[in-house]
UniProtKB/Swiss-Prot annotation:
Keyword annotations from UniProtKB, A to Z: DNA-directed RNA polymerase, Nucleotidyltransferase, Transcription, Transferase, Viral transcription, Virion
Pfam families: RNA_pol_Rpb1_1 (PF04997), RNA_pol_Rpb1_2 (PF00623), RNA_pol_Rpb1_3 (PF04983), RNA_pol_Rpb1_4 (PF05000), RNA_pol_Rpb1_5 (PF04998), RNA_pol_Rpb1_7 (PF04990)
Example GO BP: viral transcription
UniProt keyword Flavoprotein present: no
Keyword field contains Membrane: no
Localisation per UniProt entry: Virion
Induction summary: Expressed in the late phase of the viral replicative cycle.
Family: Belongs to the RNA polymerase beta' chain family.
EC number(s) reported in the record: 2.7.7.6
Cited InterPro entries: DNA-dir_RpoC_beta_prime, RNA_pol_asu, RNA_pol_N, RNA_pol_Rpb1_1, RNA_pol_Rpb1_3, RNA_pol_Rpb1_3_sf, RNA_pol_Rpb1_4, RNA_pol_Rpb1_5
Name of the protein: DNA-directed RNA polymerase RPB1 homolog
GO terms for cellular component: DNA-directed RNA polymerase complex; virion component
Reactions accelerated catalytically: RNA(n) + a ribonucleoside 5'-triphosphate = RNA(n+1) + diphosphate
């Protein structure tokens, strides 16, 4: 009978008690000795029954040697019980809730039935149990006291009598607790509290605490330090009397008490970390021991941190052998090749099994041995199952079928290539090895265009390379990890590779129409020479004579015709910025390729550059596959580099020099900037700078200076006038996108301008009021604050050089500080999302719990998308009718078609206009990413047709329309199967929505007016191609989309954090660049957010176009507290006299006059009789009141309404210039009365508290709105003619702070268009679906143009909101989403705490996802391992054919 095969479905965690230890133990430790002579001592802590790590003796239990023996635990019977150190808090909870006399619960268990199981005991223990009477035995429950000096000691205070609770007493108490009580308090029967006090502890196997002995007998030996701890425990245990009986309240001998305390501490050190040798550590009562100069090791210390067992061995990947070296570039290598030094190739070995078909190939390796390359190092003999060194073989040794030969690495082997950090899956790619025969080479070499996969460069980067050993692993590596699979980025849906730097410039120079010497032409021999290194089929030059001149476009077309495509786009070379200063050839301002022929234009970054979405290589990959695209990149690169080598290209200092006239013009521009800066300085000195609300004068001054010192766009004019764009190498590199930018060119040639650190000018931190030693204190000139007038080519002065270095130093420190935070954020994201896997229905689920009904809401793989334009979206009703309505045949079908097109347009507009209204910066556009470019398919079909333009008839037109209509109707069946399509079963709504965008595009591109010249056969071929590409674009089953989303978001987020410079309190470098991303992913509540904003549209259309009215509304909603309107205030202790009308303080004697006027003008506001002796005198800020349109009357009325226990007097509002507005607030005696009605009129604390309340009083505005400013918006609207109109004169209010509910109550605000950046505020008011959308929009807003495909953002949002609440990506969020996945949470962080909690709760962990199966030693069900393979072994055996029989058949 054959043995069955099963997988572990789940793991349960429990607390191990005495019985568990005894059942698992193979022997009992009785002595502390290690060895007796040459063998382990029987009954000692190195007993051979617990395993072996020595080759001199076998394990007695399993009879295996040290390599095969896994080890077996033993037990130590304790003479007195010990507390389980991991569960001290649990022991304390049980002692608080059960009777110490009878073990019955002393709390009402029914009160906690509504709580979830894990929270019941903790909630019961937090209640007041001291002094309660037991329901059963009527004994009063004492107070449980934790010893502050000893972590493991508990005391009971019984009516003043304090007794010590020894572990033996606690064990007796717990033994009386019933299982029914345990279950009702939320614990499992396996977690009975009696297990928390141990009489038998487990001794770990020898295999996890190995020893080393050199020789036999008295030779040198070294043992694991944990053995010393076990020895201490055994020795202390022997000092305790065997039959020790402890009765509660009875005193025991002092030496026994100390031994009990010591053995408890030793057991703690044995299990958990020991951190100190002091008697107590930090007041926690935890003592520690050391071994030599380091803390004693512990069992649990092996689990956490990067070097722990979980991350290092169980989750971390390991290989037999690996090589590492510095990388350098080699353009002679293909993108999927890697140059490997021969010294490495002779060291790294590849195991290959000898077979009939390869024995002749392997024989040279065998004969060469170690003497000559390629050779081998050793042979595994199958018959004897032994390994032989190749140099020690006998003459009669023969290589036979079945042997394994460990040969050298040779050209053609596949290898993994990796650069750390591995933030994306493309960071590990499989390349073909090319062995470099030159022995002086010791670096890895790779094509420059291949660096994009690894984010590598050649400034000293090092990479790893290792070769898979088995045939299976080599095949899997080539199929699953080949770099061709990473050509299209999962993150951006665009191509990763392309031409860079030299080859980009070469492509431009080769394809431009004219050169400085005339037309860009070459002879036949030169053109043929360009193809020498392309490693493609050489084009035919037979039709050209040696005297014929070929232009660059023709030469490139010969290459492109091998993979014919159609392409049209404006090149990077043409720019509106340069157009006024240079002459463009009309044939170079638009690049057009038709059926593989370059008709016009040039090839630069937009066409052939790395990462160019929609470029030439992207189109080739979509039509011919990524492998063909990589070949074309290499061929184009070789063509461009060969041309550059022949034609020449360089950047010299002559390219960077300005003419005297241009230099003079640049100096004039710089002088204008300096004069404007000086004018701002004069305004500051004369006090003419008036900052807006929310900014100090200094901050506003710095902002004015930064704006004034920016180089204007016209500084490009003298640069462009002094160079020749046709010959200037620096300009050509910038203009073609090969390297550099306009600011780089300005810095090199004209001037560097203002240096900014943390978005600020250089601050005076050298000393008080001084930036550098070169400038005097309080200098105001722009040069003293980091403005550099000189350019790099002109040279920098000493202070200018230092300013530049300060900026570089800031970037270095900022990167160093951010690396740890971004790395941990990436790791949290990986663990938080790794359980999200696509199932057979293309749903995303965590085990059986649904996350997305359909991945990305459309089921598409982000790598299978391309950008297309929807023609109808921007058209008006009349334009749509003129362009798309077919009137050649009178039929209701075409009315239906046009009506459908119009509905599609309106539906598209409605969806994306809603998105535009509820996002800060996402405008509607007619460009979208779809899986099929229908227009391209139609064009390719027409170009490949040889029949020309055919006449069309009414029948074929109707038939084509019917074909398209039926196809669009059945398109959602692509998500299901052909059987359901034939049966026409109902389609779920979410599948119809998933295909809606694609159906809109198909109806546009295959409208009747656009397909008149297409035959029915061609239409059928077009529809078949659309269906094929659409099916191939669907996400694969078993795809780990959670990890893909985490990688795609974390990598650009890391770059965002490094680029974000925020100001810290000290004005230096800090980590606040990660504040906003942390707020989003940590799901922080509203009150904890630091950067929340709101965008408020105005309800009245007339008002939202008037900036003045909009500012008035912004002022009215901005929260104005009384404190913001005050210049200074004083708390005075004085006696108010209504008759004398005088004041006590001489400094304020002038107040008498206006106080007298106030009483005369306000006869109804006379002072009350109970005025206390406390007065608050305040001076108001008139400027702030004017800017915020707040009157004195509104301030006083608001204060009187909110503080009735005061008497308020004030001066007049229209005071003369320089005379402040004064308010005096007298406190009444009722404000000082307490519950005892005792007068406290002299209580200063109460007066100060009242002052705080007054200052924080709200005068006007919405709570939470710290600041409100008017901003200009750009939005779209549909006019009466159905045309989409862009409005750029709309004003809205942008606030600092959020309060959606408060804003909705304002009559001037449109409640339907309120946008808040706060996820918490959105969740509270609109619900979980709105919060989901807000997470998506906020991540996109944070990342901007560098953001990933929206499918990855959907993955984040759906996971964070799956439970109905917004959960974070932190440990707490993972606990809420996957509470049962203990192994995953343990792998993320705090494994000891997670395991402890799981054991207390008796958690059952189903094995799913990635981390849990990996930790259990099985293969996760993802990717190709998601589906099971069923194999008929009987059929294979019956139909097996030997090599001889196959040869005979041949």
């Amino acid at each position: 009978m054959e043995a069955g095969y099963a997988e572990i479905a789940a793991v349960q965690f429990n607390i191990a008690g005495d019985n568990d230890h005894k059942r698992q133990g193979v022997m009992e430790v009785t002595i502390s000795n290690l060895f007796e002579g040459t063998l382990p001592a029987e009954g000692g802590i190195y007993d051979a029954r617990m395993g072996t790590t020595d080759h001199h003796y076998k394990c007695i239990t399993c009879s295996h040697q040290r390599k095969q023996c896994m080890g077996h635990p033993g037990i130590l019977q304790m003479h007195a019980p010990v507390l389980q150190p991991l569960f001290i808090a649990e022991i304390r909870r049980w002692l608080r809730v059960i009777c110490l006399n009878c073990g019955a619960p002393i709390v009402d268990l029914k009160r906690y039935e509504h709580l979830i199981r894990p929270k019941r005991l903790a909630e019961a223990a937090s209640s007041q149990t001291e002094g309660k009477q037991c329901y059963v035995c009527k004994v009063i429950h004492p107070k449980i006291i934790k010893d502050s000096e000893d972590y493991f000691t508990f005391w009971v205070d019984q009516q003043g009598k304090i007794d010590k609770l020894y572990p033996q007493i606690i064990r007796e108490i717990f033994s009386r607790v019933t299982y029914d009580t345990v279950v009702k308090l939320g614990r499992s029967k396996n977690s009975h509290p009696e297990k928390l006090v141990l009489k038998a502890i487990q001794i770990p196997p020898i295999s996890i605490r190995p020893g080393i002995r050199l020789g036999i007998g008295s030779g040198p030996q070294s043992f694991h330090d944990i053995n010393n701890v076990i020895q201490y425990i055994v020795r202390k245990n022997l000092l305790i009397p065997k039959d020790l009986q402890i009765v509660r309240g009875q005193k025991i001998p002092l030496n026994v008490d100390r031994n009990l305390q010591t053995i408890q501490q030793l057991y703690y050190n044995f299990l958990l970390d020991s951190v100190s040798t002091t008697a107590t550590q930090g007041g926690t009562g935890k003592r520690g021991i050391v071994m030599g100069a380091r803390p004693a090791p512990s069992i649990m210390r092996r689990l956490p941190r990067k070097e722990g067992r979980i991350r290092k061995s169980l989750l971390g990947s390991q290989v037999w052998s690996i090589s590492r070296s510095t990388i350098c570039g080699n353009s002679d290598l293909h993108l999927d090749e890697v140059g490997y030094p021969i010294s490495f190739a002779r060291t790294l070995q590849v195991a290959e099994t000898v077979q009939h078909y390869n024995i002749n190939r392997l024989m040279p390796y065998f004969l060469n041995g170690k003497r000559q390359y390629p050779g081998c190092s050793r042979v595994y003999k199958q018959i004897t199952q032994s390994v032989h060194d190749i140099e020690g073989l006998k003459q009669d040794f023969r290589l036979e079928v079945g042997d394994i030969l460990y040969r050298d690495v040779v050209t053609g082997d596949v290898a993994f290539f990796n650069r750390q950090p591995s933030l994306e899956r493309s960071s590990i790619g499989v390349h073909r090895i090319v062995v470099l025969e030159n022995p002086k080479i010791s670096t890895f070499q790779m094509n420059v265009s291949a660096c994009a996969w690894y984010n590598a460069d050649f400034d000293g980067d090092q990479m790893n390379l290792w070769v898979p050993w088995s045939v299976m692993s080599r095949v899997e590596a080539e199929l699953l990890c080949s770099v061709r699979n990473w050509f299209i980025s999962t993150k951006s849906s665009g191509p990763v590779n392309g031409q860079v730097q030299d080859s980009t410039v070469g492509s431009f120079l080769l394809t431009r129409t004219n050169t400085p010497m005339g037309k860009n032409v070459m002879n036949k021999l030169h053109a043929m020479g360009l193809f020498q290194t392309t490693q493609t089929d050489p084009p035919c030059f037979a039709n050209y004579s040696p005297t014929d001149l070929l232009d660059g476009k023709l030469v490139v077309s010969m290459l492109l015709k091998q993979t014919p495509i159609n392409y049209q786009r404006a090149p990077t070379w043409y720019s509106e910025v340069y157009a006024p200063y240079m002459h463009y050839n009309k044939q170079d301002i638009s690049t057009q390729i038709r059926n593989g022929e370059l008709i016009e234009g040039v090839l630069d970054k937009k066409a052939v550059g790395a990462g160019s979405s929609g470029g030439i290589y992207h189109l080739i990959s979509r039509r011919y596959g990524p492998q063909q695209a990589l070949k074309m990149i290499f061929a184009t690169q070789q063509l461009a580099l060969n041309y550059v080598r022949n034609a020449g290209f360089t950047v010299s200092t002559a390219d960077m020099l300005l003419t005297p006239e241009a230099h003079q013009e640049v100096q004039e521009i710089i002088n204008e900037l300096l004069l404007e800066s000086e004018e701002i300085n004069n305004r500051l000195l004369h006090g003419d700078i008036m900052p807006p609300i929310g900014l100090t004068t200094h901050d506003f001054y710095e902002k004015l200076q930064l704006n004034a010192l920016k180089f204007p766009d016209r500084i490009l004019k003298p640069i462009m006038n002094s160079i020749n764009p046709e010959t200037n190498g620096l300009f050509q590199m910038v203009a073609t996108g090969a390297k550099g930018s306009n600011p780089n060119m300005i810095h090199i040639m004209a001037g560097i301008g203002q240096i900014e650190i943390n978005t600020q000018r250089i601050q005076p931190q050298f000393s008080f009021g001084r930036t550098l030693v070169y400038y005097p204190r309080f200098a105001l000139e722009a040069q003293a604050y980091g403005f550099i007038c000189n350019s790099y080519i002109a040279g920098l002065t000493s202070p200018e050089f230092i300013f530049g270095e300060m900026n570089g130093r800031f970037d270095l420190i900022n990167k160093a500080l951010s690396t740890s935070s971004t790395g941990y954020a990436n790791r949290k994201a990986i663990f938080g999302l790794q359980s999200c896997i696509v199932d057979y229905y293309r749903r995303v689920s965590i085990d059986t719990r649904l996350v997305q009904q359909l991945y990305g809401e459309d089921g598409l793989d982000a790598r299978q998308l391309e950008t297309v334009r929807f023609e109808t979206i921007m058209l008006s009703d009349q334009e749509l009718e003129d362009k798309f309505k077919y009137t050649g045949i009178q039929s209701p079908l075409f009315e239906e078609e046009f009506s459908r097109l119009k509905k599609d347009r309106d539906k598209y507009r409605q969806i994306f206009l809603n998105i535009e209204n509820f996002n800060f910066s996402q405008l509607l556009t007619d460009v979208r990413q779809v899986p099929v470019n229908v227009a391209s398919i139609v064009k390719n079909i027409l170009l490949s047709s040889t029949s020309g333009v055919l006449p069309f008839d009414e029948k074929s037109i109707l038939q084509k329309y019917t074909m398209v209509k039926t196809f669009c109707k059945n398109l959602p069946y692509v998500f299901i199967n052909n059987i359901q399509e034939r049966l026409q079963t109902p389609i779920p709504v979410y599948l119809k929505r998933a295909a809606s965008l694609m159906r809109i595009l198909i109806r546009i591109e295959l409208a009747t007016v656009k397909t008149l010249n297409i035959t029915c056969e061609q239409m059928s071929a077009i529809l078949d191609l659309i269906r094929l590409q659409y099916t191939q674009s669907l996400i694969n089953y078993g795809e780990a989309v959670g990890i893909l989303a985490a990688q795609s978001v974390s990598e650009p987020l890391t770059q965002y954090m490094l680029d974000s410079h925020h100001r810290s309190v000290a004005g230096g470098t800090n980590k606040s660049g990660i504040v906003r991303p942390q707020e989003i992913f940590s799901a922080k509540p509203v009150e904890a957010e630091q950067s929340s904003e709101m965008l408020l549209r105005l309800k009245n259309p007339e008002v939202e176009t008037n900036k003045t009215y909009a500012q008035e509304i912004a002022n009215s909603i901005e929260l104005i507290t009384f404190e913001r309107l005050i210049l200074q205030w004083h708390l005075l202790y004085e006696t108010y006299s209504s008759t004398k009308k005088n004041v006590m303080y001489p400094d304020f004697a002038s107040d008498v006059e206006w106080m007298t006027d106030f009483l005369e003008n306000h006869p109804l506001l006379q002072p009350p009789e109970d005025i206390a002796n406390w007065c608050i005198r305040l001076e108001l800020n008139k400027t702030t009141m004017i800017l915020k349109s707040i009157s004195l009357e509104s301030i006083v009325n608001s204060l009187r309404a909110k503080h009735p226990n005061t008497y308020i007097m004030h001066s007049v509002e229209n005071t003369a210039s320089g005379i402040p507005i004064i308010i005096r607030i007298y406190l009444r005696e009722s404000a000082f009365r307490r519950s005892t009605n005792t007068r406290m009129a002299t209580d200063e604390k109460i007066a100060v508290n009242l002052v705080d309340k007054l200052l924080n009083s709200t005068i006007r505005g919405i709570p939470g709105i710290k600041n409100a400013n008017v901003v200009k918006l750009m939005r779209h609207r549909v006019d009466a003619q159905g045309k989409l109109v862009r409005l750029d004169n709309i004003y809205a209010i942008k606030t600092n702070g959020t309060n959606i509910f408060g804003a909705m109550l304002d009559d001037n605000i449109d409640p339907y268009t309120i946008v808040s950046s706060s996820i918490g505020d959105t969740m509270e008011l609109y619900g979980i679906e709105a919060a989901r959308q807000k997470i998506i929009s906020e991540i996109r807003t944070v990342m901007g143009d560098k953001g990933p495909n929206h499918r990855h953002l959907l993955m984040y949002a759906d996971l964070m909101t799956r439970t109905g609440q917004v959960t974070s990506l932190e440990k707490a969020g993972l606990n809420a989403r996957e509470p049962s996945n203990v192994l995953l949470r343990m792998a993320l962080s705090s494994p000891v705490q997670v395991l402890t909690d799981a054991a207390i709760d008796s958690a059952v962990n189903p094995i799913y996802g990635i981390a849990a199966p990996t930790l259990m030693g099985s293969v996760p069900r993802i990717g190709t391992m998601y589906s099971d393979i069923i194999m008929d072994e009987k059929y294979i055996t019956e139909n097996y054919k030997s090599v001889d029989s196959m040869i005979d058949m041949l």
